[in-house]
Amino acid sequence: MLRPAGLWRLCRLSWAARVPAENLGRRDVTSGVSPRGSTSPRTLNIFDRDLKRKQKNWAAQQPEPTKFDYLKEEVGSRIADRVYDIPRNFPLALDLGCGRGYIAQYLNKETIGKFFQADIAENALKNSLETEIPTVSVLADEEFLPFRENTFDLVVSSLSLHWVNDLPRALEQIHYILKPDGVFIGAMFGGDTLYELRCSLQLAETEREGGFSPHISPFTAVNDLGHLLGRAGFNTLTVDTDEIQVNYPGMFELMEDLQGMGESNCSWNRKALLHRDTMLAAAAVYREMYRNEDGSVPATYQIYYMIGWKYHESQARPAERGSATVSFGELGKINNLMPQGNKSQ
């Protein structure tokens, strides 16, 4: 017999020659995709990148890909908002892991002079969404970027970096290709993403099969992001989190949409399949534990947003320790010397 409350704790614990960008014209395509299966010697090889390429290619060539674009379009618009928050223009920008171009559609040519859109999936690039910005499509792996140092004024990435095997190296490469005083703005799924689905599958599989395998890929913890960005060389960091909750008729509809997004699990240690009765049990657990009043079930997508700047001498820096000319002990005296009307009420 399933005991959801008793098992809740179980659920919760669980580089390609460098190409100068300015030599590429509109609609040109270059490739920086790594050899299949290649990874950095120090990489934790968690994800099957060839499988992820196939998943994204399959999703991009479906008859109605826009049916599954809702989440990536929403996060893409929020990345665009953060770009607009910076009062400057960006002559050359890169969207890393662009998919079908979910960020570019929300930006304009007054803000972005030229946009490079890079993705591991060629079908996503071929079926990209319309934008008024001059664009260049680049077939490239996020782990092996084919660009020279100090190339871009802006790099953005939305819901792509959670699939790389070596996130520290990917961030280091992003920093490398940014110009001094360039900025990186990214978004990736957080650790609580799809916790409802994860828990339901674990509970059902434990009950029916005597144990469970990971069916949802692992995510980076928010506490690690600031450290990783700093280690990659970024400064003036901002990291914040948000949650988007989407309601579905049931668990199977959620899983269908994840497949349509190209977000199916690609971990090497994934289980090939689940028995039919285990899937039905998981759907029942999902509905029992998380059902809304209208009968739908929620799915939570936790999003980490990050902003980091490449150092330039013009950037504001904190004053050196001990450079203050007034001590805290003298603040009272200064207050007494101020005109009465200037004192705070």
UniProtKB/Swiss-Prot annotation:
Q: Which InterPro entries match?
A: Malonyl-ACP_OMT (IPR050602), Methyltransf_11 (IPR013216), SAM-dependent_MTases_sf (IPR029063)
| SUPFAM superfamilies recorded | S-adenosyl-L-methionine-dependent methyltransferases (SSF53335)
Transit pept. (range): 1-36
Q: List the subcellular locations.
A: Mitochondrion inner membrane
Q: How does it assemble?
A: Interacts with NDUFAF8, leading to stabilize NDUFAF5. Interacts with NDUFS7. Interacts with PYURF (via TRM112 domain); the interaction is direct and stabilizes NDUFAF5 protein.
The task this protein performs is described as: Arginine hydroxylase that mediates hydroxylation of 'Arg-111' of NDUFS7 and is involved in the assembly of mitochondrial NADH:ubiquinone oxidoreductase complex (complex I, MT-ND1) at early stages. May also have methyltransferase activity.
- What this protein is called in its record is Arginine-hydroxylase NDUFAF5, mitochondrial
What species is this protein from?
A: Pongo abelii (Sumatran orangutan)
Upper lineage ranks? Eukaryota, Metazoa, Chordata, Craniata, Vertebrata
Q: Which gene encodes it?
A: NDUFAF5
